[in-house]
Amino acid sequence: MKNIIIILYLFIVFNCDKPDSLDVEIYKLDNGLTVMLNEDHNETSVFGAVVVDGGGKRDPSDATGIAHYLEHVLFKGTSKMGTIDYNTEKIYLDSIEVLYDKLASTEDDRRRLNIQKDINRVSVKAAEYAIPNEFDRLIEGMGGTGLNAGTGSDFIYYFNAFPSTQIEKWMEIYSHRFLDPVFRMFQAELEIVYEEKNRAMDNPFRVFYETFRKYFFKKHPYGQQTVLGSVDHLKNPSLSKMKEYYDKYYVANNMYLIIAGDFNKREVKRLIKEKFQKIKKGGTIEPVNILEKPFKGREVVDLVMTPYRMIRMGYRTVEPNHEDAVVLDVIQNMFNNSSRTGFLDRLTAENKILSAYATTGLGGTDLGGFGFQFVPKDDKQTFGEAEKLVLHEIDKVKTGNFDSELLDFIKLNINMSHETRMESVSGRLWLIMSIILDNKPWEDIKSYPEKINSVTKDQIIEVANKYFNDNYLIVRSDKGDHDKVKLEKPPFKPVAPKNTEAKSEYAS
């Protein structure tokens, strides 16, 4: 009876006609910028985002962290926004750029200190002309909420929500910020980035994860670089290299504009062309084509860096747009799911292991990976014993040791979660972003429930045996402290802009 109910539910919910609110129109402007529109009048607001195909993987190998740092700086305004007198301010900003480049090429500690003092002196002077947080105030002034940005390995995004009546103003402000950015308040933002990096380095679990990725991705920037950058590179930031990154990747043919919510497409298309056609077109951006070799059997790395013993295990799989990715999604939910009925969930519930979970998200656009993290139940349980327990659960999937009722329930769970995300504009916005990251058409998102429903037991067995083989990485951390490194802030005088209530030429 339970199976009949599940099948009937799936048929009714996922085979009915999809409303227009789930449609996404995708087209390109003449300059190559990709526009993605999702009109939904069930909402009273609009969500807007600009996405750049870049991220930490495209940081120069000698200047890691640049993409993330640039994301911070792009909130500081333009030659017309965020300044009371750009012509005078620019004299100091140009000097700061020269000094930072000089600092990056200087190794002598005494000379570095003198250069840092010069940077501080000129930065304090430049701050006399800056208007802090004017971009944020402009967005808030038009009723915008949720203003944020983020940098991942594969892309950078900027977004917020706003009233539908403010869509023209939003497009004007967002297009302007990318047309003519000025890299001001560099020292102040560097201090914020230092704080982020120090928090990350203080977190043993994050350090353990980044160390695992270093061994998992032995060549690709996914493992050999971090989004926040290395300590050495953050100590020697280069404004010139940041500008080079901006000039190369913040170009129309490498950017995406996403608008979802309560708007009229016909009216908005005219505004989009007017505002975003101005963004310059750049050269062809080549993909990061770095492949990883299979692991040679069971590769083991032993460390001491976490408050309690824990293990990460990883298998090479496929990129997100591969046909096996959907099957791997089902498999991941067979190990863990929100109803706590997965194979690894049961290990924890039966007190055989303290915690265990699986993830398909080890990689990104370029390369895939399926990971497991688990914690032995106590000090008596060895790493080997905990690993055997997890491998035994993996074998259940590989041998088909599960019934069809569990599989139907897993599919239902996945599809209900997907439908929940599709129902809201904010959830849909992130799904639209995901097709950029995963290099998929929107139709794949709409048809995802049908693809999940079509996954068979035989497919699960085949895919599990294809990827969960004898070649995998296992990184084990014994209980102990990791080596902590702290980024010390240079002996700078705080940069405190005076013009907190001023308005720029742009905002007036």
Show where each model-derived region lies.
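M16 family metallopeptidases and their MPP-like homologs
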Residues: 38, 43-56, 65-66, 83-176, ...
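Non-catalytic, conformational "gating/processing" segments within enzyme and secreted inhibitor domains
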Residues: 187-191, 197, 205, 209, ...
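Bacterial Sec-dependent signal peptides at the C-terminal "C-region" and cleavage site
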Residues: 8-21
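Sec-dependent signal peptide recognition
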Residues: 1-9
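An aromatic/glycine/proline-enriched structural segment found at the starts
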Residues: 177, 181, 201, 218-223, ...
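Active-site recognition of the HExxH zinc-binding catalytic motif
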Residues: 64-72, 76
